[in-house]
Amino acid sequence: MYQSLALAQSPGQGTYADSGAFLHSSGTGSPVFVAPTRMPSMLPYLPSCEPGSQAPALAAHSSWTQAVAADSSAFGSGSPHPPAAHPPGATTFPFAHSPPGSGSGGSAGVRDGGAFQGALLAREQYPTPLGRPMGASYPTTYPAYMSSDVAPSWTSGAFDSSILHGLQARPGGLPGRRTSFVPDFLEEFPGEGRECVNCGALSTPLWRRDGTGHYLCNACGLYHKMNGVNRPLVRPQKRLSSSRRSGLCCSNCHTATTTLWRRNSEGEPVCNACGLYMKLHGVPRPLAMKKESIQTRKRKPKNPAKIKGSSGSTANTTASSPTLLNSESSATTLKAESSLASPVCAGPTITSQASSPADESLASSHLEFKFEPEDFAFTSSSMSPQAGLSGVLRQETWCALALA
């Protein structure tokens, strides 16, 4: 079966003109064979490994056919079992690469058959990681379970890719990840490790840059942007309160204690009292008005109860004013009617007036009225009772004064 595959002509032999690059190791002369899964695709290229006259002899030899039927996945220069254990010139397999001489193939197959089967079992432990794409020579090592001295560099043929070339500069395995951890951490936190070139701050809400590209903190960057100069590093001293400023003295009264320092028209410092006096009167304050202590304004405390009481009395006065007006108008009416009343009705009128509802209303409102005696001056003749009329007047209430 494999003889026909080995002798078959491949349509793509022109593409892989230098097929010996992947069938032979660059360091030794031992052949490199592929795994059984790739055998159908790789066997058509076997005739191109050697000159054309050797291909039929390779297929017809018994040792070659037996080895291919068993498993042609052998060990090259990159296998876990290096060829250094064999003497120079000896092959790793029970067959030779070229057609051997008479009597050499059969005895080698019987002698090394057990070693070859054991090597196949060890080869099955690494089925896929050893399969590398065909490309340029890469100095990278195998994964972490193989040491670098066991896995030398590979040499493969016409497969090229920019991704594979990028792998040359990256160390393989975990050491490469450890080295790239620090730059990734700094990229994730871009503010770490920066320092303001002006004030030396290490942390700021926002990093800025000056005209030359140096980092500035937020305060220095804003100051530089607004004023065009670097932010001063020396902070201004805190100003003392107006009453504790040392060395100040009023130019008018020569006092050093005041609640507020002012300046006169000449720019000289003056105390609050002298400054206000000059501002209000236009003349300097007399020295006789100087006092040792500061006079403060005596403000009376606001009493809400007193304000409320005064407002209540005002309301009562306002409410009682219409009552006074009505009482005065009613008194005027009484005077007018009394002057117009007849002398006959004068006596009963006074009697009925004492018991009228108007008197009760006046008494309830606590209003006192003074009646002048000339308004109610009656003669004795008018006050004397007349026969036949006194009883009727006392019982009837038709009198105008009584109705009022």
Swiss-Prot record:
Residue intervals of every GATA-type zinc finger in the record: 196-220, 250-274
GO cellular component: chromatin; nucleus
Compartments, as annotated in UniProt: Nucleus
GO BP: aortic valve morphogenesis; cellular response to BMP stimulus; cellular response to hydrogen peroxide; cellular response to nitric oxide; endocardial cushion fusion; heart development; heart induction; intestinal epithelial cell differentiation
MF annotations from Gene Ontology: cis-regulatory region sequence-specific DNA binding; DNA-binding transcription factor activity, RNA polymerase II-specific; RNA polymerase II cis-regulatory region sequence-specific DNA binding; transcription cis-regulatory region binding; zinc ion binding
CDD domains attached to this UniProt entry: ZnF_GATA
Composition skew (Basic residues), residue ranges: 296-305
Domain of life of the organism encoding this protein: Eukaryota
Region (Disordered): 71-112, 293-332
Cystine pairings recorded for this chain: none
Primary location class: nucleus
Skewed-composition ranges (Low complexity): 87-101, 309-323
Biased composition (Gly residues): 102-112
Keyword line: Activator, DNA-binding, Metal-binding, Nucleus, Repeat, Transcription, Transcription regulation, Zinc, Zinc-finger
Keyword field contains S-adenosyl-L-methionine: no
The protein's role, per its UniProt record: Transcription factor required during cardiovascular development. Plays an important role in the transcriptional program(s) that underlies smooth muscle cell diversity. Binds to the functionally important CEF-1 nuclear protein binding site in the cardiac-specific slow/cardiac troponin C transcriptional enhancer.
Protein's UniProt name: Transcription factor GATA-5
Source organism per UniProt: Mus musculus
Organismal lineage: Eukaryota, Metazoa, Chordata, Craniata, Vertebrata
